[in-house]
Structure formats: C-alpha cells, structure tokens
Swiss-Prot record:
Similarity comment text for this entry: Belongs to the universal ribosomal protein uL13 family.
Annotated source species: Chloroflexus aggregans (strain MD-66 / DSM 9485)
InterPro entries: Ribosomal_uL13, Ribosomal_uL13_bac-type, Ribosomal_uL13_CS, Ribosomal_uL13_sf
Keywords of the record: Ribonucleoprotein, Ribosomal protein
Protein name in the entry: Large ribosomal subunit protein uL13
Pfam family, one: Ribosomal_L13
General function of this protein: This protein is one of the early assembly proteins of the 50S ribosomal subunit, although it is not seen to bind rRNA by itself. It is important during the early stages of 50S assembly.
Amino acid sequence: MKTYHQKPSEVQRDWYVIDASGKVLGRLATQISTLLRGKHKPTFTPSIDGGDFVIVVNAEKIVLTGRKPEQKIYYRHSGYPGGLKEIPYKMMLAKHPERILRLAVKRMLPKNRMGRRLLSKLRIYAGPNHPHAAQQPKPYIPR
C-alpha cells in the first residue's frame, strides 16, 4: 500500500471556536497549534496546509500556573544597541491579552512560510464575542 499524500485541492477546513476562560496557557496553545497544523486529521501531510480555522474567545481569562503571573516577562528587541524592551505578564495581560496566546501558539508552529500561513488562520478575541458567526464554527472542547 502506498503512503497517502494529501493534495491542496483535497483539503477540507472546519471552523472551531474555543473558550479560553480558566484554561492553562501552554496546554491550550498546544491544542490550538495541533488544530491549525491539521495533525488531528488522518490525512495529515507535513508539507500541506491541511489545518482548520480556530477562533479563541475570552483570551483575557487565560491562566498561568505557579508564580508565573508575577515572574514571567516578555522580551523584544528594536535591533539597536540598548533596544531590549521588557514587558511583565500582568501588563501584557492588561493591555493586549490576545498577544499572549498568539505568541505562545506562534512559537509552537514551524518557523517558515508554512508557520506564518498557519498563524493567519488563528483569530483571538479578548472578550466573549466574535464576528465569525457566518462561518458556523463548531465548539471545540480541549481535552
């Protein structure tokens, strides 16, 4: 029997909505990255974008375990000498709660064109509402 390789024309994508309230950041991010990549499907092919669209609501209610809410710091650099910026988790949660989850998922995806394309299928909203009712998303309950 030959190995099955999915073609881009054979891909069928679903829309899933995930409620992030009370969920642990890393565990939720791994399940989202699996959905985006398509690894939950029996037709998974590494070189083909066969994943689904994911909508995450209530990103502001995501949880970290232990002392990470007080200790975690996000870093970015401007590219200039002395241009290192530090943002504590609590400040990032207050200003941009959707960036926390997007960054965690982004770092779990491939670091190439495929990863950037997969990340474009992720929609994150801080509150409980989203404008994607026309796509009829299915509720996804993370295991």
